[in-house]
């Protein structure tokens, strides 16, 4: 595997972990001052995650 392929997969894994943590945080903290901004951030992070998955699939790296 080339360096960019490893970085792409690593980025997807790290982003997936962060998405999970943010989603759990928002579920438990609906009264947080920046809830709306964090909820929008979560949506964008999920969209970016989907793009990374598509790139990985196109590169034939997803099993």
State each model region's role:
Residues 1-63:
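Extended, charge-rich alpha-helical interface modules
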